[in-house]
């Protein structure tokens, strides 16, 4: 199963069951961090900063949304998040954990696995230096 297929299935699960949706913010940020061709350089750095806020600073998504409202408003933002070229922002990386390692048999297991995956992705991403 491809990462994209798995991601799409998990989004459906997260939007249809609040127990799974509790980690939606981590699912999206970790996935995008590991699939840099979907982002601009600034977008990739922004997603990494989001994971830092969620994981290291333990900030809830509601606070981050409030703090970043103007920063990510497409009418006010001074950078693009989504890539128009599809070119990877980072060199090909072999990640220790990916979305394919997440189990979905119940919400508790799913949330624990997504959290561990996001922590792993963030930790590895901290070692990646992006020129520019």
Q: Whereabouts are the PLM-identified features?
A:
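Intrinsically disordered, low-complexity linkers and terminal regions
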Residues: 1-132
């Amino acid at each position: 199963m491809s990462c994209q297929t798995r991601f799409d299935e998990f989004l459906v699960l997260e939007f249809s069951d609040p127990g799974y949706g509790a980690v939606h913010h981590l699912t999206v940020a970790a996935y995008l961090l590991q699939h840099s061709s979907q982002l601009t350089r600034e977008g990739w750095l922004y997603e990494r900063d989001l994971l830092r806020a969620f994981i290291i600073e333990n900030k809830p998504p509601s606070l981050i949304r409030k703090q970043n409202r103007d920063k990510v408003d497409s009418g006010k933002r001074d950078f693009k998040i989504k890539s128009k070229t599809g070119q990877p922002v980072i060199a090909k990386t072999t990640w220790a954990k990916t979305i394919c390692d997440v189990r979905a048999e119940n919400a508790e297991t799913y949330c624990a696995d997504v959290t561990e995956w996001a922590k792993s992705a963030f930790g590895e991403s901290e070692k990646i230096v992006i020129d520019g």
